[in-house]
């Protein structure tokens, strides 16, 4: 993630962490911001050409950390943004299972983009949508293994609410994923 400041009245002194929501290019960095309050709600009103200051990147949510040919990406809610960004960075020879968890279908904000990436991947990216409650779709070792049979032999990347990140961490530990193959970008300023 990066810390962002926007040079506009009411925003300049505020610094907020946002993850990239698409792979970076030479000309563009993209963020997707969920309306969670005054600051995030006001971002939509920024004028084109507004000067932006950013600091980072922070965390270890990069494809360079992967060492396996199987990758499990898990995104919950707005945590899908860095997951979506990293999904397009892996090249040929890497099999990706991506789990996108949301309470309702309306919250699957990047579904169209993920469907497109999966379609153009020639089968190397499989996207699994889990829509509903935690009780309907628990993030435990058995349920994840049903979706991603190579879970135990995968590099695991997860971003989302703290409870979901911890549930996936516990499941990964149960199936034998070592700490160095578990990468998270949790909401807030901690990284492991």
List each language-model region with its residue ranges.
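Ferredoxin-reductase
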Residues: 1-53, 95, 101-104, 115, ...
């Amino acid at each position: 993630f990066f810390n962002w400041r926007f040079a506009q009245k009411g925003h300049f002194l505020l610094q907020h962490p946002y993850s990239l929501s698409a792979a970076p290019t030479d000309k563009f960095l993209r963020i997707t911001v969920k309306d969670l309050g005054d600051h995030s709600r006001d971002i939509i009103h920024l004028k084109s050409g507004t000067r932006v200051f950013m600091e980072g990147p922070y965390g270890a949510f990069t494809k360079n950390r992967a060492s396996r040919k199987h990758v499990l990406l898990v995104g919950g809610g707005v945590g899908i943004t860095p997951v979506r960004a990293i999904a397009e960075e892996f090249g040929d020879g890497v099999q990706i299972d991506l789990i996108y968890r949301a309470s309702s279908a309306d919250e699957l904000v990047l579904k169209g983009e993920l469907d497109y990436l999966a379609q153009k991947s020639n089968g190397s990216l499989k996207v699994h949508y889990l829509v509903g409650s935690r009780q309907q779709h628990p993030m435990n070792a058995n349920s994840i293994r049903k979706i991603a049979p190579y879970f135990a032999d995968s590099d695991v990347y997860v971003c989302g609410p703290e409870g979901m990140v911890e549930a996936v961490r516990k499941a990964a530990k149960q199936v034998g994923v070592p700490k160095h193959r578990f990468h998270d970008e949790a909401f807030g300023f901690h990284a492991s």
